[in-house]
Amino acid sequence: MKEQNESFVVDFVGGAVGHRFRSGEGRGQALPKAAGFTKGRTPKIVDATAGLGRDAFLLASLGAEVTLIERSPGMHAHLADGISRALEAGGAYAEAASRMTLLQGDSRQLLKELSPEVVVIDPMHPPRHNTALVKKEMRVLRELVGSDPDQVELMEVALAHATKRVVLKWPLRADPMPGIRKPSHQIIGKNTRYDVFMIFGNSLDQQE
């Protein structure tokens, strides 16, 4: 994301996102592993808290069809602009962006209609003064998106309607989300952990 005076643009081609894309770290990264990517399997994913769209773009660049849901009209407009410019950039950027479908609305309602295989949820967390969350872009994002007081309800809806798994992106040392069952397993990143909730009843998922 590039800053422009008092505003910003979502940028999937340049900056940190472009660097991450060009590095080609692939399916071995923590998020793709948590989402169920394997050598021969690419899941269909709903990013229920799209935000900056970075995670969705990473997953789309690895071949997944990703539906992004953003309830903030302002953030939705920034995401639409970012996807449009990635399409215009051509090549692998356009290929990844072509797999991204952007919806504006409340994930708690839309998930019931989509019945997704995999849901990724990254709630807005309280700011931590010694992390990148104090950066201007994150402050602006917080102003656009606000807090997520309904994050527990969103998790409950996701667990009720996902067909394979739900992935909760959570601060590494934070307590578990209250009121939600224990995750099936966790994938640990540098500063983040991914709590993975398998939706049992699918024999393939139970073997993963």
From Swiss-Prot:
Domain of life: Bacteria
Keyword terms: Cytoplasm, Methyltransferase, rRNA processing, S-adenosyl-L-methionine, Transferase
Organism: Agrobacterium fabrum (strain C58 / ATCC 33970)
Catalytic activity: guanosine(1516) in 16S rRNA + S-adenosyl-L-methionine = N(2)-methylguanosine(1516) in 16S rRNA + S-adenosyl-L-homocysteine + H(+)
Principal location listed in the UniProt entry: cytoplasm
Subcellular location: Cytoplasm
Protein name as annotated: Ribosomal RNA small subunit methyltransferase J
Pfam families: SAM_MT
A single cellular component GO annotation: cytoplasm
Residues reported in the UniProt entry to bind S-adenosyl-L-methionine: 54-55, 70-71, 122
This protein's encoding gene: rsmJ
